[in-house]
Amino acid sequence: MLTKDGESYVSLKQDICFSIPSICSADLAARCGLDAFPENAIQLNARIEVLKRLREVQRQVEVAVVGLSRQLHSIYETLRSKDPSQWTEVTASEVANMIHKNPTAIEIYAIHKLLMDNPMRFLASNQYAANQTFRIRPMNEVKDLEQVQQWVREKSPALDRFISKAREVADVQVKLRESSREDQPSYVKGEHLWSETDKTIIRLCVASLGHQRSIQLNPYLALVGHIIRHFYDMRTVKHDDHEIHRLLMDIGVFTPWEDLLAIDAGYRLDLDTRLAVVQERDQAILRALENSKEIKPRHPEDFYPVDPLESIRHDWGNLAVYVVDDVGAEELDDGFSVERIESEPGSMWLHVHIADPGSVIPPTHFLAQNAAQQAESWYTVPRTFPLFPKSLVHHPVHGLSLGIRSKNGIPDRVLTFSAKLDSAGNIVDYAVRAGLVRNVNRISYDSVDVALQIPSPLFEYPFGGAPISKASPAPSDFVEDLKAIREIALKQRERRIAMNWLAFNRNRAEVKRVSEFPSPPNGIVGAQIDTPHLNKGFPNLVYIVSSTRESGDVGFRSVVAEMMKLSCRVAARFFTDRNVPAPYRTGQPLIPTSEKAIEKLLSKRDELGYIQEAEGLTDFIYEPRAQYQLNPGMHFGLAIPEGEGYVRVTSPLRRYNDLVAHWQIHKVLLNEKEGKTSKDGVKGMFDKAWMHNYINTLEIQSQTLKGIQRRHNRYWALNYINNWQQTFKDGKNRHLWPRDPQGNPIPDPLEGLEGYTISGLISNQLVQQVQLNMVIPKLGLQPIVEDVVADLDVGVVLGTKITVNLKDIRLGMKANMITTIDSSRMKWPPS
């Protein structure tokens, strides 16, 4: 990147927030070169020309911003939510159109700069680079910021009074926590009361934990840093996020089992667990189900009064449908059947039956709109945030989860994706139909593994607590069908490996709850400010380390995954053959360092196509992430060739984009029944322009949710380890130390840590240290290695084995494990 001052440096793609393509041509940009300094006269002259243009743009922007600055307050007052506690959103272009009739790129950029420079009121969204959307801070939060700023500036005694009281509360809370290590989590009514001044400071501390991109200044940093320094008598504060989280736990506002990501207001999850509120919502849904009369619903509370596809549903009669999932699964989206073809030995039809929420919920319903915003069900450690309410999903008559209606003598509505497969596992024909299934059989993955005598996935439990499998085999009359289905899956795997497919085997940590978490005293998940409480105990959790290979290609779980892939390929053919727009999921192959590197990688594959990550890091540059697009394309990760396509349709109860595809199929099936076709294909519910816009939104949501899931998994893994450390610190509570099946104490999982590097040496200017990123397979985590003594010019080969000691666990919104190199167990720097 070339700056207006002539400096050149590398920038992350996601940190580039605004582009004006017309400033210079691609040719002029190319002539500037990529080096930090110009290497010849051509590069120098090109850079001089670009700098002239940049400075002219800068001059125009400065003039525009001066005029806009005076309007900042009125812009905020006009756009903020009228509810002083709620966030709202606006794009830079929308603000520009409020002020200018036909805003130029310079005027839009001036708005972008003005709002970006005012984080107290305007916060750049997580995917700002893609949508230029700002979140507008609620008025209450702005007032809290302004008030605490004033108190800090004036050295108000209000802060001293709060810190004095907070220390007294923390003394009680910390002692209570230490004395209740064996207890189940619970709330204890506090004897303290927070004043209105205290509440202002606490609200500010809570709000400071909201996720914010580093591309903007953080208006909370100086304020919470001041509070932390005085509360903990620190001279300097380097990790505000971690320390403010610690403070809020120490004074009982947060519990150690609070899920910081879920309570972030930016994600708009339903945090109200009050029984009366939940019951009223459920009753409203049930009333709407009974009262909806419009065949074409228009009101946001109207469901379909009758099934839109009732006249064209294929009745599958007594055909056995197998729904295989985890024992505790709540939303059962999919089941499958096999139909042998007597006249064609080796060939068979696979029918994948998917729950059909589109038969009840129209796109206009408020539940659909809420689902569009949430994007998918959230499975957090403390609780599940379903895409649709349980009262609807499990309703005995209108229920959407497979098996609910048929259990009550009413056939389940499904969309069935059928693939005719030859003896080699190739799709030679397909069909997509609306259907009715009656013979739904729910069984668990483990019971099928036992019945078929195949290995189940092997997961590691480094902190103990491995469950003892008690699964009984699936009924014997299911076995032949289940074997046939597994044979289909094995052929798909063979096909994939023959296409030179490969994947890296990586370990990943996951924490699961063993028992339910307590409900918050006020019934609303999040900070307990108005009703002061303390807390004790810690949830019963289990720490699991799974590998990509075991979770993806071992046991009947992998068979079900292959069936879902086949149905998504069928869906793609359905849309492609009819020229109907759909959200195709694609993924390009990894980028190798050379042609020889490809051969090297392929030679390292095991029988399932996997390579241990540490063995392949030096042979590829990067793995392109999966994307959505309007046309069918390659998906290397699923071994789908260019042009075939893949459209997700198998989880409409858990993913909104699958439901979008279902609605599209509904309309196509109805139009085909009525003969409404044209030379351009069959029309769906959504046209190409709508689908294009939706795919842009879906792409943003997909990347955001992946990031959230990574942070969530890391936070809970580190929270678990932090609690483990505190429980057994200084030899305490040894009677609680887990034991193996033979009754012996398990080895200390935090001793003898080793792994491999996944980055070169990093000079972190913020903390003035040389660092490394690494993987510890035993824990399934990627910690930071600090205090690295090494020559930056020498570097470290990716995949280098490394031994480390645990230095620190930092929680907060950006949880991290910090390690240091254990030079007693390895030579450092490596030669």
State each model region's role.
Residues 809-829:
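Internal insertion modules embedded within essential enzymes
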Residues 233-320, 324:
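Short glycine- and acidic-rich boundary segments immediately preceding or forming the N-terminal edge
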Residues 786-807, 827-830:
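C-terminal structured domains
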Residues 1, 830-831:
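Eukaryotic N-terminal targeting leaders
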Residues 5-7, 15-225, 231-233, 302-790, ...:
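Electropositive polyanion-binding surfaces
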Residues 12:
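Beta-strand/loop-dominated core regions that host nucleotide or nucleotide-derived cofactor-binding catalytic loops
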